[in-house]
Amino acid sequence: MKTIISLTSIPPRFRTLPAIVYDLEKHQDVDEIWVNIPYKYNRFPDTEVVVPDFSPCSKVVVNRCTDYGPGTMYMGPAHSEKCDADLMIAVNDDTKYPPQLSSRLVELYRDEPAAWCLSGFRIEEYINNNGGVRRYNNEYVDVTESYGGVILNMNWLRRMKDSFLDFYKLTYNDDIIISNLLSKMNISKKYVNNKHVHVNTAEQI
């Protein structure tokens, strides 16, 4: 199955973005790394978008697209006719991910096709514990978070792309939108503790 990593960014972070992408290419076993950069940013309407130089990276696909806020990492490839991937691993642009994260997530997906994540929570527990959540393993969650990395079937994203736009008008919280639409499609969302996939915790930089 063709697997891509997908992320997006904003102009203030472009200076560090090439190093993040290079680190992903060096340590993650995927076919392509999609860097989704909007033509224009809703948050930065007067900023001229100058795409960073990714020439040292052989797997990078720079996808110029519409701005869907943080959800651009999901919707950029979903709306692109050039994207022929089977699986996507969504990650953040300000996080250093542990080696082998992608291969571990693919293994989990092959064993059980679900939206597997290394960061997520159950809404009731999150509310009752004032944002504190316990670390699950191989258990369901209500919300997957791209911070820790989440693997999704591209067909799921293609099916939800029109509905995503309706929700996007109400909130920029891409994790909530994606998780809600996965639930509507009866797709399981499962959390795996990083200790059980033998990878280190993602490190925000």
Name each model-derived stretch.
Residues 1-3, 11, 15-20, 165-205:
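C-terminal catalytic/acceptor-binding lobe
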Residues 1-22, 40, 62-64, 75, ...:
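Catalytic phosphate/metal-binding cores of nucleic-acid and nucleotide-processing enzymes, i.e., regions
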Residues 2-7, 23-24, 31-36, 88:
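Hydrophobic targeting segments
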Residues 7-9, 37-39, 117, 193:
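Short beta-strand/turn micro-motifs composed of small residues
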Residues 19-32, 39-42, 53-55:
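Short, acidic, metal-binding catalytic loop of nucleotide-sugar glycosyltransferases
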Residues 36-85:
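Active-site-proximal specificity loops/subdomain of glycosyltransferases
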Residues 77, 96-166:
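Conserved catalytic core of nucleotide-sugar-dependent glycosyltransferases
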Residues 84-96:
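Short beta-strand-to-loop acidic/aromatic patch adjacent to the donor-nucleotide binding site
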